[in-house]
A protein has these predicted regions:
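Conserved class I S-adenosyl-L-methionine
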Residues: 67-76
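Non-catalytic substrate-recognition/targeting regions of SAM-dependent transferases
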Residues: 1-50
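S-adenosylmethionine
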Residues: 125-183
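Conserved SAM-binding motif I beta-strand of class I
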Residues: 91-96
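Class I S-adenosylmethionine-dependent transferase superfamily signal
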Residues: 61, 84, 170
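S-adenosyl-L-methionine
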Residues: 100-143
Length: 183
């Protein structure tokens, strides 16, 4: 299955393509990484459906999440949240603005029998982190894995402001002595 359907292909003068290269098959596939099972949606997931470049960062969650309350922002498939759950986190909340992502992450929690400790909710991280901070809500581990805020040089300054703002909001959510991870 080919996923060459990102906007930057047009900027580079390449056509966008998406579809089967072989006979059709179920595009929801199961993979295992760091002992965590995932159903990855190749056809409708963000970009390729799963971000393999974050494998080591997800594995690092196993060292810091045991016994902690964890917040995973921009959760997508729930990969950081699920690693926190497998590592023995007391509770994990993953949030994403996409209901499709929340549904996929919830399905992955069930696949790993983590649904009692690992929950997912639909929220805009920019909005909810400010709200929760004002309410005094905090977590032992806060993970931010936001999408790219820029695709061109013209918007780099805006992107820097966006990263600064979301990281400041995330840091305010960390309990004293806790951990803040941003990718």
């Amino acid at each position: 299955y080919e996923r060459s359907d990102i906007k930057t292909r047009e900027i580079e003068g390449l056509e966008q393509r998406k579809g089967f290269l072989t006979e059709p098959f179920d595009t929801d596939i199961q993979i295992v990484e760091n002992g965590v099972k995932y159903i990855v949606d190749l056809e409708n997931g963000q970009k390729t459906g799963f971000f393999l470049d974050q494998k080591e960062n997800r594995a690092a969650m196993h060292r810091i999440c045991k016994g902690m309350d964890v917040l995973d922002c921009f959760t997508h498939t729930g990969s950081f949240a699920l690693n926190a759950g497998i590592a023995g986190a007391k509770s994990v909340l993953g949030i994403d603005v996409s209901q499709h992502a929340v549904d996929c992450a919830t399905r992955n929690a069930e696949l790993n029998n983590l649904q009692d400790r690992v929950k997912f909710e639909k929220h805009n991280a920019f909005d909810v982190l400010g709200d929760w901070s004002r309410e005094g809500k905090q977590f032992g581990v806060v993970i931010l894995d936001p999408p790219a805020f820029t695709k061109s040089r013209n918007t780099v300054k805006q992107a820097i402001r966006g990263y600064k703002e979301i990281n400041l909001r995330g840091i305010k959510m960390v309990k004293e002595g806790g951990y803040f991870a941003t990718c």
